[in-house]
Amino acid sequence: MDKNTVIGLVLIGLVIFGFSWLNRPDPQEIEAQRKAAIEAARQDSIAKAEAELLAARTQGATPDSIKQAAGYNQYGLLAAATAGAEEQVELANGKIALKLSTKGGAIREVLLRDYKTHDGKPLYLFREGESDFNLPLRTVDNRLVDTRDLYFSPISRTDSSVVMRLAVDSASYLDLAYVLLPDDYRLRMTVSGQNLQSLFPANMTMQDLEWSQRIRRQEKSWKFENQYTSIYYKYSGDEVDRLSDSKQEDKKTLEEPLHWVSFKDKYFASVLVCDSYFENNKLAQKTAAAGSDYLKNCTMSATFPLDVRSGTKARFTFFFGPLKYNMLRAYDKGMKAEDNLDLDHLVYLGASIFRWINRYMIIPASTFLQQYFSNWGLIILLLTLGIKLLISPLAYKGYLSSAKMRLLRPQVQEINAKYPGKDQESMMKRQSATMNLYRAAGAGPMSGCLPMLLQFPFLIAMYMYFPTTIDIRQQSFLWAEDLSSYDAVFSWTADIPLLSQFYGNHVSLFCLLMSISNILYIRYTMNQSDTGQEGMAMLKWMPYITTVMFLFFFNQNASGLCYYYFLSSIITVIQYMSSRFIINEEKLMAKLEANKTKPRKKSKWMARLEEAQRQQEAMRRQQQKRK
């Protein structure tokens, strides 16, 4: 080859290279051509499938190829994932055992290893057919495909983790990665994808999610357990709220973003936490048949941020476990206030001051006592003594006031004898003279109510605490097998109208003892504080009526709560009796007589009362003049 030939070939090569370089397509054109090719192939596949399906219908045959075409017509690129064999994948640690299914790639069963049902059976939060988790996939060709209908392949499997893979083809897939935390009730779930540009729309930024669960009955009293069963949810960076636990059916549509949603019963919960947020939330619950094996049917649907085309991931955390207050609070340690999960609000402790008492006084005290005592009967006794000791200084003032009223009773009876009439004028004079006596002696007629008023917030706080604390669940004391439920010493199966509905088909002994002790408390305190006024006679039956109502109301409640109220009443009576020995009534009477000779400044309350009496007397006289 001569020199000129070589030069010519080089020049030709340079010309060809230069022409190719100058006329090369830009990256956008290449991507557009690739998408066009994919779309053309997809449309061609659809056309072929429809043609085969039409031919099969015409010929009356259904060969495998026609079934595949029909599957493609419904599921598109995911048609291949509709065929497969369902397989169970087990994950476990020391606290829970989970079963996941390759069909849908979701959790099918949750067993809590440390807990039993009321009748001693293994405690499952749900089993096969009782829970459903679904990601409706909206594809680029406007199909809506449910992951519950598709088969996933388990990869990277260990005893505590697995990746469920939904394959589109060899290079395109959707992954659900599960990791069970060691010695914990939490399960991490990550949703991610690879090369899914051909599956999802170009403008996709949110993914749909559906979750449902039939909440199983775990405790002895269906009615009482159902009262604490509901859907709870937390607004992103805000407070925790819930659906009504008393309505037969309830539902809400929430546009505000949510951080988590929970299906909870009295002592256990299933919680789904989104690391980002849920939007377009729809929550619904419906109460199951009374006395059945289920409490409520709960469902949620929402959307969450996800763009799998760009390789982003959506992270979630499932919590399947007991509602132990201190454990749930510990999940927020080290977090910023706005990032707190506030899962401790799943334990209902009341509102305002009652929650404050439980959170900062009762729970720390009971936690401390559990370090030294294992018997909850003893712990409740010590809690009761502690509360009584805490309010004893102020309660003493109440007992002192009751003693004053008791010592002044003969003088009040003299006033009643002086103005015996039942007409309005006599009643006004009698009331005015009695108030003047109390004011002169330095006694307050309402001060005797102070002990009850002081312990009232604690009584309400305990009413919120005992039925919801899992610490007393299946803890026995004396004849009570479970302090979190009623202690039936006698029961029957026949349905007695009204009685069975409002009282139940059993007799709770601690409830009965509570009622008896409350009657003793009422009789003793009313006898000590009775002033002899007619108004007292009119009101003396009210506490007894209330006690009978409580007998019906608490018969199906936690026996631990009734035991606390029983102790509280007995200790209060003992305090009253002890005050008779502590307070020197002779010295107190001398002090009252001395007070009568001293000039006393009227209290604002007494001044207003006397002013009201004067106005009432003036109106009465005007009415008499008109007559």
Swiss-Prot record:
Pfam families: 60KD_IMP (PF02096), YidC_periplas (PF14849). Keywords: Cell inner membrane, Cell membrane, Chaperone, Membrane, Protein transport, Transmembrane, Transmembrane helix, Transport. Its main location: membrane. One of its GO terms (cellular component) is plasma membrane. The keyword NADP does not apply. One of its GO terms (biological process) is protein transport. GO terms for molecular function: membrane insertase activity. It is found in: Cell inner membrane. It comes from the Bacteria. It is a multi-pass membrane protein. The chain crosses the membrane at residues 3-23, 376-396, 450-470, 502-522, 534-554, 558-578. Required for the insertion and/or proper folding and/or complex formation of integral membrane proteins into the membrane. Involved in integration of membrane proteins that insert both dependently and independently of the Sec translocase complex, as well as at least some lipoproteins. Aids folding of multispanning membrane proteins. Interacts with the Sec translocase complex via SecD. Specifically interacts with transmembrane segments of nascent integral membrane proteins during membrane integration. Belongs to the OXA1/ALB3/YidC family. Type 1 subfamily. HAMAP family: YidC_type1. This is Membrane protein insertase YidC.
